[in-house]
Amino acid sequence: AEFDADGKQNILDRSEMPLPLGKNVFTSGIVNQETQNQLIQVLKRYREQLQGWGISPEETYCFASSAFRDAKNRDAIMDRIFVQTGFKVHIVDGIEENKLMYLAVTDCIKDQPIDFKNENTVILVVGGSTTEIMMMSKGKMAGVHSLRLGTVRIEEQIKNQTSSYSDIQRFVQESINNTKGSLESELNIAEVKQFIAVGQDVSLASLIVGRPISTFLWEINKQDFSDFIRDIQEYSVDECVARFKMSYSEAETFQVSLLIYN
């Protein structure tokens, strides 16, 4: 991205490569050798892309979040990344991650008809390891919670059980109910008028059943969203790949991710 004199952001280029870092860490506590090799290859491709813009690894900031934070061998991997690619990786802690997400959301909606100052709002971000919840009471932060409820964690806990739609839905609901008391002590959930969901999976859902408000902001009717989630639970991973043009690793957690948002 580049920024003009007024501080306005202009996206120049964008790249994304799926990698099962989270699945490694949440199952074994480490990033295994095969995934490390894949990570190095991805970063080398990014390095080549950046070189096309005249940007060196020394001028580039690399950030890692929950999967790296939890990996027992993170220091060794960071050293390997630096030696083989030139990128220096910075690990973002949970508090900073929430702050950056809040800033990103407020920047996205600043010129849109969303009333932060007079309405109660919940911002939800579903990841592989955790689900981050930010609660806003009339423009002020009322509470921040990190639930141990992520797509990869759920997949691992239910993979040896029957994984029907109702089973997964029940598991997610029970996990959320365990923390509902602490959430209610900070903000009356019944009074929340605005629900802002952030993430690739919910963005895809918005393209299918939502309506655009701006370039990066979409609105989804709650019932349409629930109906869509129920429909896709019948799809296999291969069907999700074919229907939604996503990678296999993305398709593996797509259905569970949307269940958490719902």
Predicted regions and their residues:
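N-terminal glycine-rich anion-binding loops that anchor highly charged ligand groups
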Residues: 9-19
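Helical "lid/coupling" subdomains associated with nucleotide-phosphate turnover
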Residues: 3-5, 20, 24-57, 67-120, ...
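Active-site-adjacent helix-turn-beta-strand microarchitecture at beta-sheet edges
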Residues: 127-130
